[in-house]
């Protein structure tokens, strides 16, 4: 080739390149293009095709998570990508500016392509891909369309998200949840409108549309808060009757579930404890008795949420009171406390939200009363009614997931056993509690817009009620409170404006060098994971309880407490010469492990009513064990008075939705120690093989402790073999649920009782407060109010079976309501939040079982400006709590 020809060829090549560049074309780089294809769910194992500016095509296949990589060598830009998912055909435009960056394909990139190309339908977009008319689009036009989509999403959220074209994210799959960026894909629909985008209502991807139901209640015969029972009915010691106890209707189960869950969270046992005077359905938002029976009319919508396999799912519910004002919308989350079902927070966050005209977003967070009777192969459905497991399929609230052969073999070896959802789902649902709470908020926005928005000519409903114009408070008590805190940590979309919680079960990831002081005393052990301190308490509480005279519920442990002391001494875990010395030593061990003198008299009732059950459920859930694993020799079953296993009657399962708390023993299902001497027996009556004593299954308790620590608690030897493998699973599960305390500057209130024996403040509230203050630094807006003479179970206070709670303790629920009021005023009106403080209450006193009426003088308010002697301070890594 002569020089003249080479120069002419070069000139033509440069001119061609300039022409291609002017219309967005040009040679692509040899680097691979990569990204994620999703439509809420990952578009897995699907063909993704790229067409270039001159009609060349190249294809690749996405992996199981929707990820792809495509070599662009030789292709001319712009490219148009196309992939077919279960919901449609999706496209993305890629320019030279996108090389080296993530290039996703999803419903958002499809919308961007529509606007960039000036098209009005999906069919037109597919035609553009086929005929190549996209070749004229410029990189600037694509970027402009993407910016307009982000403008619309910012108007929706109140904060600008990352570009869904290029953000790296984790989509949901059939058996795992996606991250918050993935949730945004189906939080709201978008479509081009003029030079920008309109947003419209969309059912979130994770919600099962075929499970969705909605019911309106008139506020008279039935209602949202009291199920038609009113203040008087909730106060009755007699639960509502069933027309046929063997087959209650869904409406009857709902009424009984509301009755039992309300009374389980607040003290409604007697009017002397504050019900009907300080709190309750009849008390208005100003604290006055003006609401009569307190029934609240409105809409209730409910659905399953989770993966498509049905293995990992939670229940979501939204209650919208008739007083809801769409011009001033508000949402309160009410994630269930404990392992309770969907109505588990009805009496706490539910009541507060409904009275304030807010929609209430509930979730059972993947626990609840999911019972599988393995002998009869029956399960409960979403509404609590009973069905055969095969008939229910994945719509069962929970199924153990055993094949017929596996179930038959297990039934033969361990007859009449029960599988329970929180313990045996093999999903470790606690890792998703924050996400479940955020899903409940997203579901609330969907329900509200379905109710209040008006469809346009296309039949779609523009978003009227959005995160940007809605006040959202994450709230609840106990496990629900921990879920609210985790939701706030995970909230990348700005759905939550503030947090106000009570007695949170929250597990700090690490305190590091942080210290906690009460008065002048440094707490020796703090910030331990839940199962760590529970397995420790499970060893020593029965014996320690004997050191505290006048303990409420002491009679419940009388049959095994002394034997527990004796057995611990025999194993070298106590050294006292007699029972009294052993009990004192056991109590000292609890003091050294995070409990304090405020808890001494409550250890008896807690071991009798809570500790072993929580140990067994959480041991199973953290290790993702099956019911067939019988971890540490424990199982669930109905038992006879002598403690032997007996068949569970159909009536037990028929009513479990209403009476169960999600953690056996509950509703007729007890905790059984399979390995007891003489055969399987209820745990509190079990004789341990290694001791020969009826010591409430100490051998099982020691096994549980070993799985948490990784070593034998008696010999100190490291675990090996099967026990080591089980321990590694349990400890991995614990790591999955720990919090990092990064609240991102969200205003947050934590209210806890100093006398909380179940979730000691040194391990939870105090520890989390210190860690979060350290993590967020100057940006922290976390406030902590510690209430003296208050604890975890308000329902114990005036319980006839626990005299002495009433004389010693005040209802923490009063301060939960105050915390909610403070947060609401802060978010709505800019009112200042009081500084962290100790609130010093006065117990009612009097005679155990008949304490005098409580009054406002027993319950001073959270002070706007606390006295110096009551101020809680955090400085230089030390949390200082006044004595």
Regions found by a protein language model. Give the residues of each.
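Bacterial N-terminal signal peptides that target proteins for export
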Residues: 2-11
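General secondary-structure edge motif
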Residues: 3, 129, 133, 137, ...
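C-terminal motif of bacterial Sec signal peptides marking the signal peptidase cleavage site
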Residues: 19-22
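A short acidic-Thr-Gly-centered motif at the start of a beta-strand
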Residues: 24-26, 740
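Feature for extracytoplasmic/surface-facing segments of secreted or surface-associated proteins
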Residues: 26-195
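C-terminal His-loop and adjacent cap/lid subdomain of alpha/beta-hydrolase
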Residues: 194-883
């Amino acid at each position: 080739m002569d020089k003249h020809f080479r120069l002419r060829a070069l000139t033509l090549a440069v001119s061609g390149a300039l022409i291609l560049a002017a219309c967005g074309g040009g040679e692509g780089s040899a680097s691979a293009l990569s990204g994620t294809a999703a439509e809420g769910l990952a578009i897995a194992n699907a063909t993704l095709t790229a067409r270039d500016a001159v009609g060349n095509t190249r294809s690749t296949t996405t992996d199981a998570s929707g990820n792809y990589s495509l070599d662009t060598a030789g292709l001319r830009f712009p490219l148009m990508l196309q992939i077919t998912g279960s919901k449609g055909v999706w496209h993305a435009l890629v320019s030279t500016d996108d090389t080296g960056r993530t290039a996703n394909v999803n419903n958002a990139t499809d919308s961007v392509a529509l606007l960039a190309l000036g098209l009005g339908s999906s069919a037109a977009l597919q035609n553009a891909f086929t005929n190549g008319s996209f070749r004229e689009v410029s990189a600037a036009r694509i970027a402009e369309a993407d910016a307009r989509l982000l403008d619309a999403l910012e108007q929706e959220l109140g904060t600008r998200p990352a570009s869904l074209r290029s953000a790296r994210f984790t989509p949901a799959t059939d058996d795992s949840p996606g991250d918050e960026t993935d949730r945004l894909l189906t939080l709201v629909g978008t479509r081009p409108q003029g030079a920008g985008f309109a947003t419209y209502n969309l059912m979130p991807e994770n919600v099962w549309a075929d499970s969705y139901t909605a019911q309106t209640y008139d506020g008279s015969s039935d209602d949202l808060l009291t199920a038609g029972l009113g203040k008087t009915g909730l106060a009755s010691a007699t639960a509502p009757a069933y027309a046929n106890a063997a087959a209650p209707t869904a409406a009857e189960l709902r009424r009984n579930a509301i009755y039992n869950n309300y009374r389980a969270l607040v003290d409604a046992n007697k009017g002397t404890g504050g019900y009907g005077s300080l709190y309750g359905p009849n008390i208005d938002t100003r604290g006055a008795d003006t609401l009569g029976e307190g029934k609240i009319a409105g809409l209730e919508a409910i659905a399953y949420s989770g993966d498509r396999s049905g293995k990992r799912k939670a229940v979501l519910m939204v209650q919208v009171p008739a007083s809801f004002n769409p011009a001033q919308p508000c949402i309160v989350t009410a994630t269930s406390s404990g392992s309770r079902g969907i109505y588990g927070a009805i009496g706490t966050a539910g009541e507060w939200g409904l009275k304030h005209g807010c929609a209430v977003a509930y979730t059972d967070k993947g626990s609840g009363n999911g019972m599988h009777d393995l002998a009869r192969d029956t399960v409960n459905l979403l509404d609590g009614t009973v069905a055969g497991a095969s008939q229910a399929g994945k719509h069962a609230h929970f199924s153990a997931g055993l094949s017929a052969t596996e179930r038959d073999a297990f039934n033969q070896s361990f007859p009449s056993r029960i599988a329970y959802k929180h313990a045996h789902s093999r999903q470790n649902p606690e890792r998703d509690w924050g996400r479940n709470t955020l899903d409940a908020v997203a579901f609330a926005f969907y329900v509200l817009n379905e109710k209040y928005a008006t469809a346009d000519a296309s039949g779609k409903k523009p978003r009227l009620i959005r995160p940007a114009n809605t006040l959202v408070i994450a709230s609840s008590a106990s496990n629900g409170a921990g879920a609210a805190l985790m939701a706030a940590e995970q909230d990348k979309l700005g759905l939550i404006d503030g947090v106000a919680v009570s007695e949170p079960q929250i597990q700090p990831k690490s305190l590091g060098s942080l210290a906690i002081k009460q008065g002048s005393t440094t707490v020796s052990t703090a910030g331990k994971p839940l199962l760590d301190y529970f397995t420790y308490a499970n060893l020593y509480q029965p014996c320690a309880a004997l050191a505290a005279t006048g303990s409420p519920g002491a009679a419940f442990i009388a049959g095994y407490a002394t034997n527990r002391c004796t057995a611990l001494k025999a194993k070298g875990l106590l050294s006292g010469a007699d029972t009294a010395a052993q009990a004192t030593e056991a109590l000292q061990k609890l003091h050294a492990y995070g409990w304090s003198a405020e808890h001494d008299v409550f250890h008896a009732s807690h071991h009798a009513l809570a500790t072993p059950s929580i140990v067994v459920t959480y041991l199973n859930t953290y290790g993702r064990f099956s019911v067939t694993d019988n971890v540490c020799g424990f199982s669930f079953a109905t038992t006879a008075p002598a403690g032997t296993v007996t068949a569970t009657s159909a009536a037990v399962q028929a009513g479990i939705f209403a009476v169960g708390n999600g953690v056996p023993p509950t509703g007729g299902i007890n905790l059984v120690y399979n390995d007891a001497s003489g055969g399987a027996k209820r745990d509190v009556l079990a004789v341990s093989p290694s001791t020969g004593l009826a010591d409430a299954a100490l051998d099982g308790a020691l096994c549980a402790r070993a799985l948490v620590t990784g070593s034998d608690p008696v010999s100190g030897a490291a675990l090996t073999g099967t026990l080591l493998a089980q321990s590694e699973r349990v400890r991995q599960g614990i790591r999955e649920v720990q919090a990092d305390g990064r609240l991102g500057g969200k205003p947050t209130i934590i209210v806890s009782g100093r006398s909380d024996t179940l979730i000691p403040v040194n391990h939870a509230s105090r520890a989390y407060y210190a860690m979060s203050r350290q993590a967020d630094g100057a940006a922290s807006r976390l406030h902590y109010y510690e209430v003296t003479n208050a604890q975890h179970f308000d329902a114990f206070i005036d319980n006839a079976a626990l005299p002495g709670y009433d004389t010693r303790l005040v209802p923490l629920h009063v301060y939960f309501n105050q915390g909610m009021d403070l947060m609401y005023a802060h978010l709505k009106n800019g009112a200042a939040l009081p500084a962290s403080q100790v609130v010093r209450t006065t117990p009612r006193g009097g005679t155990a079982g008949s304490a005098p009426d409580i009054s406002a003088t027993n319950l001073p308010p959270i002070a706007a400006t606390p006295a110096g002697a009551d101020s809680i301070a955090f400085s230089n890594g030390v949390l200082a709590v006044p004595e």
